[in-house]
Amino acid sequence: MIHGNGGSIRAFSHNIPYFATKYHVIAADSRAQGKSKDPGPTLTFETMADDEAALLDTLHIKAAYVLGWSDGGIVAIELAMRHPDKVIKLAATGANVQPDASAFRPGLWDGWKKQYDADKNKIWKTDEERNRWKLFMLDWNQPNIPFDALHAIACPCLIICGDHDLISIEHTVKIFQNIPNAELWVVPSSGHATLIQHADEFNKTVDEFFSSPTSRRASKP
């Protein structure tokens, strides 16, 4: 399980107990977040995907079912592209593959642009402030995954968003359309936190996807 920007494994408090009854759950704080430190000046999703692959190697796990939320969904997608042998199936909720306004709900990116313009020349005085800006810049500049690059993903994927998500439905649909073996689930009456707002349904649906013998290219109503 891979959490979102600025989060930690606590993001999955509504999900880990369910999945732990059937799976060996692996959850770690991503670098520069939660209890994990990162002294470097910048972050990339590619590096974070490599971290996840290295974690599996360290634990002597050949491949895993991967669930990612928000930035964690981006990391999951990068993991499937960079280390295809590590991913059995992938479920990503609230993920984007471009950092510009086209990926987000109307007006949302404009607020981030104002924040960027206000803070881009600031000199941060503390490690906490520098780390917070590093995480902001991660999402401001990244990801930059061309839609046609998603054609390389070989594993079955469940692409998820809420119908009131931060990520636009149109962007989510384009991700789904460009992955060869993918299913799409737009969660009704949900914002970005699909896995929290609709935890029971989310857990059962993702579990069903992971445990099904085959994956079909279809949209879940």
Q: Could you say what each language-model-derived stretch is?
A:
Residues 189-221:
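Catalytic active-site module of serine/aspartate enzymes centered on a nucleophile-bearing elbow/loop
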Residues 133-149, 155:
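Active-site nucleophile elbow and catalytic-triad environment of alpha/beta-hydrolase enzymes
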Residues 74-82, 88-118:
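Flexible "cap/lid" loop of the alpha/beta hydrolase fold
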Residues 13-14, 27-67:
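Active-site loop/oxyanion-hole signature of alpha/beta-hydrolase fold enzymes
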Residues 1-35:
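Conserved HGGG/HGGXW glycine-rich cap/lid loop of the alpha/beta-hydrolase fold
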Residues 172, 176-193:
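Catalytic histidine neighborhood in serine/cysteine hydrolases
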Residues 153, 159-161:
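Short beta-strand/loop motif that positions the catalytic acidic residue
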Residues 166-171:
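Conserved alpha/beta-hydrolase "acid-adjacent" motif
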